[in-house]
Amino acid sequence: MKHFEANFDGLVGPTHNYAGLSFGNVASYSNAAQTANPKAAAKQGLQKAKALADLGMTQGVLAPQERPDLYTLRRIGFSGSDAEVIQKAAKQAPALLNACCSASSMWTANAATVSPSADTRDGKVHFTPANLVDKLHRSIEPITTANILKATFKDPHFFQHHAHLPEHAHFGDEGAANHTRLCGEYGHSGVELFVYGQEATNPNAPKPKKYPARQTLEASQAIARLHQLEDESTVFMQQNPDVIDQGVFHNDVISVGNQNVLFYHEQAFLNTDAKFDEIRRKMNADMHFVKVATSQVSIDDAVKSYLFNTQIITLPSGEMTIIAPTDCQENLAVFAYLNELVTLGTPIKQVRYYDVKQSMQNGGGPACLRLRVALNDQELAAVNQDTLMNDALFGRLNTWVEKHYRDSLSVKDLADPQLIVESRTALDELTQILKLGSVYQFQK
């Protein structure tokens, strides 16, 4: 039986905009109020996904959320027709309207945490949608996320879906952006590394001072229990609070792993040596810890370029490749480091660069755009085949984007009631292309 890692990229939604909603995310804040190009953003994401499929990788797509989210706006007291709800919110509470129009679900690294069947006691692939309670605009995602995941990974013989964790700061969960699975081979049991920002129930434990720690130890432990993971296949490691305060809002901004490689900045973690020893002890394979020193790449350069928000993939040839944003080429220190990295004798042998600038300007690089799902060939056969990237789907989705998406969207445009009609028309057609059924509230 073959085993491999599939990547499921989030399709960029029609309301992609720069409202600067994510405190602690430097790129999101610094580009607030710029005019976005939803059509270009969606096409950039599709091109990156298709490029990985063309490399021989198993690549899928996940549908975006319904936005504007009129159901949340009605729940908080705005009434009338759909157009009146939008107009009232724009006048009385524009910040709330902005939150209900966010296309942030494109960053599917935050959609859920996934544990493969090789790690779980019941031998199923487990999914838990992230509750994303730290950010209003993302906290309204989990129910629809669950619908989309269930429509993509449908067969209960292979896939186990859990409800998101309780919606409280104690269980703040940001999904796979704070989770890396380390292993020798994808089909062998591995070590699931859960990285957290603070302990919610321990006021004396280290935590950041300036920006919020979005992931708690308690949430990570709950996910491990739900996913039926053994103690010997889990490691819980704290992210350095100082780097959170420098804009490292998720662990995938400061480290990334694949199989037996963990690529990380030397300032990424607390108690690094002891925790790496624990990983080595629990692994059934040799580990390569690839450290980037501050003298080579500063935290500031790492955050601006998203050096660590890259993907490390294993090609069908067995060779590892980094999928990086073109921003890494444009940063002299980062580009020099990556050119050196491929000569150092690690399993990482090449770097490929892709333009995802529309996403980058909102604070999300290549790793943010994908949810990793390790599968075997039987499990892959049970996945909704209409969500898997190939030439035909790439063509259909590009045509769909060209038909439905605007090429310019400013924050003030979010008050246009026509955006509701455009978005729902697009998503209704998308559910037919991907054969998802009725995953959105407006379809029910």
UniProtKB/Swiss-Prot annotation:
Its EC number is 3.5.3.23. The active site is at 174, 250, 368 (nucleophile). GO terms for molecular function: N-succinylarginine dihydrolase activity. GO terms for biological process: arginine catabolic process to glutamate; arginine catabolic process to succinate. Substrate binds at residues 19-28, 110, 137-138, 214, 252, 362. Keywords: Arginine metabolism, Hydrolase. Pathway: Amino-acid degradation; L-arginine degradation via AST pathway; L-glutamate and succinate from L-arginine: step 2/5. It catalyses: N(2)-succinyl-L-arginine + 2 H2O + 2 H(+) = N(2)-succinyl-L-ornithine + 2 NH4(+) + CO2. It is an enzyme of class 3 (hydrolase). Homodimer. Belongs to the succinylarginine dihydrolase family. HAMAP family: AstB. Catalyzes the hydrolysis of N(2)-succinylarginine into N(2)-succinylornithine, ammonia and CO(2). This is N-succinylarginine dihydrolase. It comes from Shewanella denitrificans (strain OS217 / ATCC BAA-1090 / DSM 15013). The gene is astB.
